[in-house]
């Protein structure tokens, strides 16, 4: 998981000279401000809209939009899995030809990017279809076993409008595959980020603290302790990061001096912020205090990351600044409002988990039974 804010060319004092030995003109202050301002804005969009869509996703019953719930066990294992993946990629790039690895990764992310972008633009595109558009419903269903032992492996519902969105997304996919243009990269990166915030749900605040705390250590080690993360980020030709040129004002769309932000720095804090929005809604106070607090904390943390990176001219582990801000600010607000207990007792169940469904049914049965008893006593 790429989770660092850096400038691949200007990440250090020596980086003004590219690998071919030619001198790269230094970026102008205006170009730097435009690049990092754009990265900040691009990071906020999937968090904000992904959080809003996560609420509808949690309430929805569509099998194609079921969220994936992260438990405390998943959160504890995630930094280990991410470290193994990162180290594996680093070794692959050292041992095998970078050209062939990136070719395979490009094909893989070409397919994933089309699906993610199609899912992202579908709600917006629905507004442009005429009322008499011939929209047909489809279902892709794969099962294993038969009778009572039948188990659904894939159950995806879609319609003709989704197929149109898939076609439009394929155009972006071909553009990315052929040109590797930074705009196509960012379209896929934004789609991945929004889908991650929307569909990955933490089951409670404690799990979020475990996940962010573990990745806090992960980020510091792999950025400051080794050059592994920065090396992989530079070698990895896939839309796992948002990029924006610092020389856009001089070279236009053909600019090539990029600042970058890993998608991990968007999705990981984003799913925690989305959880706090759902917690806000569960309080039924018609306020989104914790969501706005954590959202402002993210802006502060990422802004501080960019500032520190610019001062020290070195890639920064963004989660070093984002994690304390995104956890600390909402907890301080909860302390001030006396809602710490409510915050840490808020729980979301996995809609795919039969045990959770059974427990929910039992709770509703018990609740209705207690109501009947109360009526009889009256």
Swiss-Prot record:
Carries keyword Transmembrane helix?
A: yes
Report the residues modified as Phosphoserine.
368
Q: Which domain of life is it from?
A: Eukaryota
Keywords, A to Z, come to: Cell membrane, Endoplasmic reticulum, Glycoprotein, Hydrolase, Membrane, Phosphoprotein, Protease, Transmembrane, Transmembrane helix
InterPro entries from the entry? Peptidase_A22B_SPP, Preselin/SPP
Q: Subunit structure, per the record?
A: Monomer. Homodimer. Interacts with RNF139. Interacts with DERL1 and XBP1 isoform 1.
Q: What is this protein called?
A: Signal peptide peptidase
Taxonomic lineage: Eukaryota, Metazoa, Chordata, Craniata, Vertebrata
Gene name in the database record: Hm13
């Amino acid at each position: 998981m790429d989770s660092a804010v850096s400038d691949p060319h200007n990440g250090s004092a020596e980086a003004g000279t590219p690998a071919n030995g030619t001198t790269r003109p230094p970026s102008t202050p205006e170009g730097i401000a435009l690049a990092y301002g754009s990265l900040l804005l691009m990071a906020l969009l999937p968090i904000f809209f992904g959080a809003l869509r996560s609420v509808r996703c949690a309430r929805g019953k569509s099998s194609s939009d079921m969220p994936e719930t992260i438990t405390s066990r998943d959160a504890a294992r995630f930094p280990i899995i991410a470290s193994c993946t990162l180290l594996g990629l680093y070794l692959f790039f050292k041992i095998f030809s970078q050209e062939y690895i990136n070719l395979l990764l490009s094909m893989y992310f070409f397919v994933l990017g089309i699906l993610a972008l199609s899912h992202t633009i579908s709600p917006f595109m629905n507004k442009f279809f005429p009322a008499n558009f011939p929209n047909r419903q489809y279902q892709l269903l794969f099962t294993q076993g038969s009778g009572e032992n039948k188990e659904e492996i894939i159950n995806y519902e879609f319609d003709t409008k989704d197929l149109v969105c898939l076609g439009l997304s394929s155009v972006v996919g071909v553009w990315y595959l052929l040109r590797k243009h930074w705009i196509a990269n960012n379209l896929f990166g934004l789609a991945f980020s929004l889908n991650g915030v929307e569909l990955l749900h933490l089951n409670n605040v404690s799990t979020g603290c475990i996940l962010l705390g573990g990745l806090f250590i992960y980020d510091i080690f792999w950025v400051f302790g080794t050059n592994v993360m920065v090396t992989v980020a530079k070698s990895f030709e896939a839309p796992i990061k948002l990029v924006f040129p610092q020389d856009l004002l001089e070279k236009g769309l053909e600019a090539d001096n990029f600042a970058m932000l890993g998608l991990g720095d968007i999705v990981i804090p984003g799913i925690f912020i989305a959880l706090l929005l759902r917690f806000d809604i569960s309080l039924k106070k018609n306020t989104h205090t914790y969501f706005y607090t954590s959202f402002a904390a993210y802006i502060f943390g990422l802004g501080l990351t960019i500032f520190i990176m610019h001062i020290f001219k070195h890639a920064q582990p963004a989660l070093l600044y984002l994690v304390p801000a995104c956890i600390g600010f909402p907890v301080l607000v909860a302390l001030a409002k006396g809602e710490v207990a409510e915050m840490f007792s808020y729980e979301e169940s996995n809609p795919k988990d039969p045990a959770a469904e059974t427990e929910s049914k039992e709770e509703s049965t018990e609740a209705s039974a207690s109501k009947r008893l109360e009526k009889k006593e009256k």
